[in-house]
């Protein structure tokens, strides 16, 4: 039964963006006002910390989104960094139907990067965010990311790193809401065959973003009971 729930949730995540993309192919997409992507700082801090268990997030650096990108509002001491990703953090290349999530201002995806990912992966998401906030479309974002990585302006991905996404208050897209608590594994150049070849919609783990590139992401679910609630302390 639980595997069936996984499949239905994944199919929803896959096909809702695809339907939106097909309906908008006839006209250029426009970004909503930047204010639609922002949150009150206190609320964003609480939501960011809900990405991981308290023993991690209470000691993590917290960054919040402003009109000029992500900025630290709390310096941690364990090397982890927690933020709330927006739709700007959509895949750079594949799956193609996910790329238009940059235009979805409702996305709120709390994530806590481990120390290695905080150094090697977070700058990539920050660059994507800044490019989108300057009005770049998904193709232009991909070009900007590729150019920056080639010039060494983004850290090279040196092996696998990971992040927590355990918040029960995550909203992965309009009409989808929260999904299963899961780990994001940043696995450069991985493709789906390297994690078992699981078909999309089947029980995880499987490749979710940008297979075969430096930015490949493997998603691994954890027990549903490990969800973390965003609560002020």
What are these language model-derived features?
Residues 1-8:
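Bacterial N-terminal signal peptides that target proteins for export
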């Amino acid at each position: 039964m639980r595997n069936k729930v996984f499949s239905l949730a994944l199919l929803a995540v896959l096909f809702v963006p695809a339907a939106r993309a097909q309906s908008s192919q006839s006209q250029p997409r426009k970004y909503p006002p930047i204010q639609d992507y922002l949150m009150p700082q206190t609320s964003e801090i609480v939501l960011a910390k809900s990405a991981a268990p308290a023993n991690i997030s209470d000691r993590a650096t917290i960054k919040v989104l402003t009109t000029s990108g992500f900025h630290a509002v709390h310096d941690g001491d364990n090397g982890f960094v927690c933020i709330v990703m927006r739709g700007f953090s959509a895949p750079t290349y594949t799956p193609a139907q996910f790329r238009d999530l940059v235009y979805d201002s409702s996305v709120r995806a709390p994530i806590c990067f481990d120390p290695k990912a905080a150094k090697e992966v977070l700058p990539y998401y920050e660059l994507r965010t800044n490019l989108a906030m300057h009005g770049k479309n998904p193709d232009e974002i991909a070009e900007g990311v590729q150019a920056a990585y080639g010039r060494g302006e983004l850290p090279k991905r040196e092996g696998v790193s990971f992040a927590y996404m355990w918040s029960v208050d995550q909203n992965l897209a309009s009409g989808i809401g929260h999904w299963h608590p899961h780990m994001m594994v940043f696995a450069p150049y991985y493709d789906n065959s390297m994690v078992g070849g699981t078909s999309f919609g089947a029980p995880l783990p499987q490749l979710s973003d940008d297979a075969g590139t430096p930015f490949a992401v493997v998603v691994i679910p954890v027990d549903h009971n490990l969800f973390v609630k965003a609560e002020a302390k």
